[in-house]
Structure formats: structure tokens, C-alpha cells
């Protein structure tokens, strides 16, 4: 028994999607102004095509579960709230990854999002600046103490956003907000980096007289599937039968597979053939997409 999964949502698309058929390269591509949405409409097409092939055939197959999530692009939020007790399958195949058909994702990181809301005190910058508490200055000092960039082969961090101030230069800024993230495929390093993001807060509050509202939100946890595990071997045998060359990779972002694995369902990611997702240059190779439907069906026929 297996679950076939994909997500229904896509990133912001400027209110339109205009697919273009590129006959020379045998692809569907975006129009250069917005996304194609192959991430992850191609995953949905793959699953539906697999079901079509299975129902049209008299080949025996095990039970099949289909899981279409929402809010994946917003931080893998939708599948976080699946009722995993309702799933009977202990294997899941998530058709959501960039790359040619044959790419299998065996690992993805944990991710935590951090928010700092820094409260200072406003004052007139010309008449009585000494009565103000500058939130920007405190935020800058805080940022300099936060981990940033690659921390190790397993862990990355990023200070992504700061909001502060107004267009008026005569006001001491009383509020600033910082957004940051951390990712890691190592559980110990993930816990350590979470502590590093929290560590400077008290010192900054005391030194600059601000108050800081701090929130850390672990969005999903890492997983790693070994190549010899059954969930992988089934996919590899199906690929071999279809003449697909497998490529086993780790992914740098989260996916619905993170939550499946967290709840004891062995899950891997499979690429349906799209590239440059989330950009106006997104495209998908049509032959890869068709083959991926065949692959999903072959996997379903192989899982008893």
C-alpha cells in the first residue's frame, strides 16, 4: 500500500498563468512575466495520470491513498495538519522536486523561522532625541550577534528581512522587526542554532533599553531515507523497468515528505521534470511529465 502525494497551491503568480508550448525544446514554459506553476501542478497531473493508467489496466495493485495538500509553499503548512492516523500506507511518494525524471529526494532539512519585534521609544529627533530609544540601533546590534550564512555542511541561516522607521528623519524610531531562518539536516546542530538565535536578546534589551518580543516557529523537521530502504528500492525497480536513470539527492528545502516521515510514514520526493520553479523562467519537459505518470503507476503496481 502506498500514498501518492502532491500539493495544490503555487507561489504568487501575478493573478495569471499563461503556459506556452515550446515546440523546439518540447517543453511547456512560463511567459517570462510570471510562473508556470509546474510546481506543483505537474505533481497533481502525475498522480491523476497514474490513477487513470491504473484504472484502465487489469494489472493487480495494492490499495492506493492520494494526499493533495495546500499551503505547501507557505512553509509546508497544509500537510502539517494532516490526520496521519487516518493513513494506512507506510510508504509515500511525493511528486514535488525540481529536476529531470529520475531525481529522487532522500533527505530534507529542518527549518525554523524567527521573528524579533523590537520596541523602543519615539521622540523628536531635533528637540529631545535623548528621550527616545532607537529600535533600529538595537536591531542592528542584535543582527550583528545572530548567526548568518552557512554554519556547517549541514546547517544554514539567513537574516532575511528588517522593517523599521518611517520616511520622516525627525522621529527616533520606536519599532523594528527582524525576520530570519535556520535550516539543518543535523538534529544536534539544529538545536544549537536555535539557542544562538535566542541568546543575545537579554543583553540587547539591557544595553539599549528596548523590549523584544521573540518567536521561533519550527516549521518542519529533517528526514533522511537510506537508499537500501524498501520505499526507495520500489521506486528504483520501477525506474529500471521504464529505462529511467535514477539520481539520488538531498534537497535544500522542505516538502510534504518531512511531515510524512515525522509521523512514521517513509516518504521520498520524486521530480516530475520541472526546472526554475518560482521564477518567470519556469519550464517542464513534456516527456518527463508523461514518464512520471507511468512511473507513479508502476510504483503503485509494485506496492502490495
Pin down the residues of each PLM region.
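Phosphate-handling active-site elements
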Residues: 52-65, 146-155, 303
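Buried hydrophobic packing segments
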Residues: 44-54, 82, 139-143, 260, ...
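Midchain, well-structured core segments that form catalytic/ion-binding scaffolds
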Residues: 8-10, 16-35, 71-206, 210-221
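Histidine-centered active-site/metal-ligand motif
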Residues: 7, 61-62, 124, 275-279
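Active-site metal-coordination/substrate-binding segment of hydrolases
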Residues: 1-68, 89, 291
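Zn-dependent metallopeptidase/amidohydrolase metal-coordination segment
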Residues: 168, 174-176, 244-303
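Catalytic-loop motifs flanking and including active-site residues across diverse enzymes
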Residues: 39-46, 135-138, 231, 256, ...
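Active-site-adjacent substrate-binding region
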Residues: 137-152, 194, 220-268
Amino acid at each position: 500500500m502506498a500514498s501518492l502525494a502532491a500539493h495544490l497551491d503555487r507561489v504568487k503568480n501575478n493573478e495569471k498563468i499563461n503556459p506556452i508550448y515550446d515546440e523546439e525544446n518540447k517543453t511547456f514554459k512560463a511567459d517570462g512575466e510570471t510562473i508556470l506553476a509546474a510546481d506543483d501542478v505537474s505533481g497533481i497531473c502525475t498522480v491523476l495520470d497514474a490513477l487513470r493508467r491504473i484504472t484502465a489496466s487489469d494489472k493487480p495493485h495494492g490499495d492506493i491513498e492520494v494526499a493533495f495538500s495546500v499551503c505547501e509553499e507557505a512553509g509546508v503548512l497544509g500537510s502539517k495538519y494532516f490526520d496521519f492516523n487516518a493513513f494506512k500506507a507506510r510508504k509515500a511518494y511525493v511528486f514535488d522536486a525540481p529536476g529531470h525524471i529520475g531525481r529522487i529526494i532522500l533527505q530534507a532539512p529542518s527549518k525554523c523561522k524567527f521573528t524579533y519585534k523590537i520596541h523602543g521609544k519615539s521622540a523628536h529627533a531635533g528637540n529631545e532625541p535623548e528621550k527616545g530609544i532607537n529600535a533600529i540601533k538595537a536591531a542592528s546590534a542584535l543582527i550583528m550577534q545572530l548567526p548568518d550564512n552557512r554554519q556547517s555542511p549541514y546547517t544554514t541561516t539567513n537574516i532575511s528581512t528588517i522593517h523599521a522607521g518611517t520616511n520622516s528623519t525627525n522621529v527616533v524610531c520606536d519599532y523594528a522587526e527582524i525576520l530570519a531562518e535556520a535550516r539543518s539536516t543535523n538534529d544536534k546542530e539544529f538545536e544549537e542554532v536555535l539557542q544562538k538565535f535566542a541568546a543575545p536578546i537579554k543583553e540587547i534589551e539591557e544595553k539599549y533599553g528596548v523590549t523584544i518580543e521573540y518567536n521561533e516557529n519550527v516549521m518542519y523537521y529533517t528526514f533522511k531515507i537510506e537508499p537500501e530502504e524498501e520505499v526507495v528500492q520500489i521506486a528504483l525497480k520501477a525506474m529500471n523497468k521504464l529505462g529511467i536513470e535514477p539520481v539520488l539527492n538531498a534537497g535544500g528545502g522542505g516538502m510534504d515528505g518531512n511531515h510524512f516521515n515525522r509521523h512514521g510514514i517513509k516518504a521520498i520526493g520524486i521530480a516530475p521534470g520541472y526546472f526554475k520553479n518560482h521564477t518567470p523562467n519556469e519550464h517542464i519537459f513534456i516527456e518527463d511529465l508523461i514518464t512520471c505518470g507511468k512511473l507513479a503507476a508502476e510504483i503503485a503496481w509494485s506496492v502490495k
